[in-house]
Amino acid sequence: MATAQLQRTSMSALIFPNKISTEQQSLVLVKRLLAVSVSCITYLRGIFPECAYGTRYLDDLCVKILREDKNCPGSTQLVKWMLGCYDALHKKYLRMVVLAVYTNPEDPQTISECYQFKFKYTSNGPVMDFTSKNQSNEPNMSSADTKKASILLIRKIYILMQNLGPLPNDVCLTMKLFYYDEVTPPDYQPPGFKDGDCEGVIFEGEPMYLNVGEVPTPFHTFKVKVTTERERMENIGSGILSPKQLKTPLQKILTDKDDLEDDQEHYISDEFDTETKMEEQEKNPGCSVRREAGFICEEDEMKSKGSPDFSISHSQVEQLVSKTSELDVSESKTRSGKIFQNKMANGNQQVKSKENRKRTQLESGKTVLHPFDSSSQESVPKRRKFSEPKERI
């Protein structure tokens, strides 16, 4: 038992540096948070088969981590895309990664679900910070609170993915990278990517936007958002979203003010009521399955130098962490049971522009999102640089 606990602690340390006192340590953490987030989403949404994942423990939470596998070309390709993301992150060019799901290999512009991972770069101090709508002005957190905040984000992803309706049986993936144009060289492309063509996308059904959470540091801020079909939200009721989120007007849910102030209720927030879901899991202990695997971040863990000790109390984080402290991965809830296909295509789907997110309903009932992304960097929309994968599978 002691040996198993030691191994789990070691695996957790592999993902999260003990301290965030330098920009390099912060970069390592952000890369690994991106890796864990993408891995959890693709696993829980049933994108790739079991063999494409390894296992790591984040304290008491067992997570699946995507890895290269000769029997799953799709996972190998996605790992290569992630390495391209790391290159752009390291150079401080990367602003947003969009991972999109679509169903027709010949029509990657019509998407069924997408996940946005946003990045900001700052340089305000030596300790990572975690903020929310109610904590934006609080002081920096200790390293222990930083770790709790990061794990909390992963737990939230798990809870959301476990309760969304299943994807279609046969889906494809594509990835888009967006940049801070004022600092990114016009000819820059990460390894494995090429210049993309921004055209706007069509969303199958009626889109719902969910703000999953963020983990800021003095050097980086990492945010996660999800867009899915309204029909898949049937299980996201009062037991998961608080009444406050459920009262959010539809007009606001469908308005993405993006980088202006993400937290001003333009998305459904993800402060899920996890207590109800934990009670359900306790009633069905036989459904919980722990699993195993590897990790796609290959950097050595940074040797951190001492950081100041900020013993700040954050009751909201503590409460949410305690509510989800027993969270397990339930196979009956997480896998959609779809037919696994190793075809992945690079499409022209795009994240919703904050000012241009006016929705137009087609006769077919699909929603046009115009155009993909014109963030707060520009007051006048113009074509923004973005990249898409060179190869499709």
Swiss-Prot record:
Cited SUPFAM superfamilies: The spindle assembly checkpoint protein mad2 (SSF56019)
Places the protein is found: Nucleus; Chromosome
Modified residues annotated as Phosphoserine in this record: 375
GO BP annotation list: blastocyst development; meiotic cell cycle; meiotic DNA double-strand break formation; meiotic recombination checkpoint signaling; meiotic sister chromatid cohesion; oogenesis; regulation of homologous chromosome segregation; spermatogenesis
Positions occupied by motif Nuclear localization signal: 382-385
GO cellular component, one term: synaptonemal complex
InterPro entries: HORMA_dom, HORMA_dom_sf, HORMA_MeioticProgression
PTM characteristics: Phosphorylated at Ser-376 in a SPO11-dependent manner.
Residues forming coiled coils: none
Domain of life (superkingdom): Eukaryota
Regions of compositional bias (Basic and acidic residues) in chain numbering: 352-361
PANTHER family: HORMA DOMAIN-CONTAINING PROTEIN 1
UniProt function note: Plays a key role in meiotic progression. Regulates 3 different functions during meiosis: ensures that sufficient numbers of processed DNA double-strand breaks (DSBs) are available for successful homology search by increasing the steady-state numbers of single-stranded DSB ends. Promotes synaptonemal-complex formation independently of its role in homology search.
Protein name: HORMA domain-containing protein 1
Organism lineage: Eukaryota, Metazoa, Chordata, Craniata, Vertebrata
